[in-house]
Design a protein with these regions (language model features):
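C-terminal end segment of the histidine kinase catalytic
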Residues: 173-199
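Two-component histidine phosphotransfer core
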Residues: 1-172, 182, 186
């Protein structure tokens, strides 16, 4: 039986999440947004993924300091990190826990996305941001199969950070096989809006 028949309220909520999520993905990506808005978009994505994978497979917690909720951040930097966790970190049978944190630092803002998934080797981590790699870094699933694309998503987020915040800001990845992965986004100083294109 479909979700519409068995849980109509949940189905209605998911439809709203999907509509809002899809609308935002088509919006202007050249304009800064607030951290709160990024978190809302990330939450919509998580809600959709939880419905897809079933209750209990994804456990997500968010801890955003009140002082940084209105901070300006590059658009579409959180959802790709969450997607990476789900696509590349999940074990075959165990639930995946993801924790998102954001807080003010002496230099600006720090956002951390961490999971307790399968993790990565030092070799894979060392090559995540190499643009010249012809093939994406590999991540190995619990059944020994290979997943690709993790590095491309991270590289795109890094490029977006540099576009709005400059080279003084960036991203670091810490990971341990069998333990999990932590992605640290560092937004230092003040962002800048790129000049509009002229005809």
């Amino acid at each position: 039986m479909s979700l519409v028949r068995t849980e109509p309220d949940k189905a209605r909520s998911l439809l709203i999440d999907f509509s809002n999520y899809y609308r935002q993905t088509l919006s202007d990506s050249d304009t800064l947004t607030t951290l709160e808005h990024e978190v809302e978009q990330g939450t919509r994505y998580i809600n959709l993924m939880q419905a897809r994978y079933g209750d209990g497979r994804l456990r997500v917690s968010v801890d955003i300091d009140f002082e940084v909720r209105d901070s300006l951040v590059p658009p579409f930097i959180l959802q790709p990190l969450l997607e990476n966790c789900i696509k590349h970190a999940q074990r075959e049978t165990e639930p995946l826990s993801i924790h998102v944190r954001a807080f003010e630092t002496d230099d600006g803002l720090e956002i951390i996305v961490e999971d307790d998934g399968i993790g990565m080797s030092e070799e894979v981590c060392a090559h995540l941001f190499e643009q010249h790699r012809r093939e994406e870094p590999e991540s190995i699933t619990a059944d020994g199969s290979v997943k690709r694309g993790c590095g491309l998503a991270l590289f795109n987020v890094l490029q977006r950070i540099h576009f709005f915040y400059g080279e003084d800001s960036g991203m670091r990845v810490k990971s341990q096989e069998g333990v999990g992965t932590q992605v640290i986004v560092e937004l230092n100083g003040e962002p800048h809006e790129p000049a509009p294109l002229t005809a």
